[in-house]
Amino acid sequence: MGTNKKIFFKIKNIKFEYITLLFLLLPIISCNFINMKFKGTGEEQLFINSNKERPCPNKITVDDVIIPNPSCKYKFPNKIVTIKINLNKDIKSFHKMFSDISNIIEIDLSQLDTSLVENMANMFENCNSLIFANLSNIDITSVTNMEKMFSNCISLKSLDLTNMDIAKLTNHKMIFNNCIHLKIHI
């Protein structure tokens, strides 16, 4: 019997891509692990259903608005392999946001507004299948904590950190711990 895990995101304009299908989810729909429920404000709330009868999407693209709860750790299901987020909201912490997603291979945060983010600690920790993280164009001028941000990302091949202003960064302990294949471009 499946269990429901509530994910505390309000999302607008979300698209779920499947291996062979692309769905644009309507206000009330249930398909492949994902139930979107309309809240009357034009925003949806995301629920992950662990029912084994329905396969999980392998890619999520979020455009326009995503509003996480204050602690946004462990928010994505383990079977997703690609995440792309375009964000324009005032969020100060991404602590453990993508940590322990063992199947994720690609994350694109290039359109993410991170100008107010202060904490990126453990953000991708234990994403041991992660090969590519597009962090180009993100603003980390307010970030003070990146401890273990990529720790144990053993498949990560390269990161482009050129043009990143790390003047406020005070904690970067073990940021690339056990990233045995990583090449950094600075």
Label every model-predicted segment.
Residues G2-L116, K183-I186:
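N-terminal capping/linker segments that flank leucine-rich repeat
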Residues I28, M149, C153-L156:
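Intrinsically disordered, low-complexity segments
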Residues N69, N119, N145:
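Residue-level detector of functional hotspots within protein domains
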Residues P70-S71, S99, A121, A133, ...:
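A sequence-composition feature that detects small, non-aromatic residues
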Residues V81-K89, N103-L116, N128-T144, I154-T170, ...:
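Structural signature of tandem-repeat unit edges
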Residues H95-K96, A121-N122, E147-K148, K173-M174:
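Register-specific detector for alpha-helical tandem repeat solenoids, activating on a conserved position
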